[in-house]
A protein has these predicted regions:
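Cysteine-centric segments in proteins
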Residues: 25-238
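Sec/Tat signal peptide C-region and signal peptidase I cleavage site
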Residues: 20-24
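Bacterial N-terminal signal peptides that target proteins for export
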Residues: 1-10
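Bacterial N-terminal signal peptides
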Residues: 9-18
């Protein structure tokens, strides 16, 4: 397996840090990562990157991507989001608590794709965290917001595609189409509004669902508006 130089360099540093440190860390949010060298080293360690590689292979197979590709896969870490606090005791080889999302880009045969993986701590610290494939792409929405939005987006894609009876439905991609900006309507300004497009594969056909996310000015959450679904020209691979 061939990895980009960035990943190779990270792993070299990680191996040293992991063998040289033996102290406890608690990472409550992304803001704590800058001062949590042990945890960061663990997250970017070879076993974690290898898990990303295996998940990417599974995801490519699921989506029918690059099945005839003979080149090696490159795994490029992109970002980490701490979803639940990570507890890493000094006497454990693995964290005992915590969930984090690892966004990464896979490179193969001249093409690349963003995938996401959720890592869930085992609870004992005796075994590695469990990696689970999450929705692909680069959405800025939190997992909770994605969950709240998903049903409405699926209904829109299904109803407007004419494939209401389709049972083979996958989220193929999520991407930001317009970064956070201010929107003024009827004299009221909404700040931090952003737009995304979610691509669904329904029975071998692709449909884009544009979504507008509107953060509440008082911090009460984020609302969303689902726009009309559009068929894409590129057909999904079986």
């Amino acid at each position: 397996m061939i990895r980009p130089l960035l990943v190779q360099t990270m792993i070299a540093g990680v191996l040293f840090v992991l063998t040289a440190t033996a102290y406890a860390e608690t990472v409550n949010s992304n803001a704590d990562l800058a001062n949590s060298k042990k945890t960061v080293a663990y997250i970017y360690s070879r076993p974690m990157v290898d898990a990303l590689y295996r998940l990417a292979i599974e995801q490519d197979k699921k989506f029918g991507l690059q099945q005839n590709c003979k080149s090696q896969y490159g795994v490029e870490p992109y970002s980490i989001v701490v979803l639940q606090p990570i507890d890493f005791p000094d006497n454990k080889q693995h964290p005992i608590k915590g969930i984090w999302n690892f966004r990464y880009q896979i490179h193969r045969c001249g093409e690349s794709k963003f995938y996401n993986a959720l890592f869930i701590a085992s609870g004992t610290g005796e075994t590695p965290p469990t990696p689970r494939a999450y929705f692909p792409g680069t959405s800025n929405a939190s997992p909770l917001l994605i969950k709240d939005t998903m049903v409405a987006a699926l209904v829109r894609a299904s109803s407007q595609s004419g494939l209401k009876d389709c049972k083979e439905i996958d989220v193929f991609d999520m991407r930001v189409t317009e970064d956070a900006h201010d929107v003024t309507e009827e004299g009221k300004t909404h700040r931090g509004v952003w737009n995304e497009t979610w691509t669904f594969r329904l029975c071998g056909k692709m449909f884009d669902v544009p979504i507008t996310f509107i953060p509440d000015a008082t911090g009460g959450g984020t609302s969303f508006v689902i726009h009309s679904a559009k068929s894409t020209e590129a057909a999904a691979k079986p």
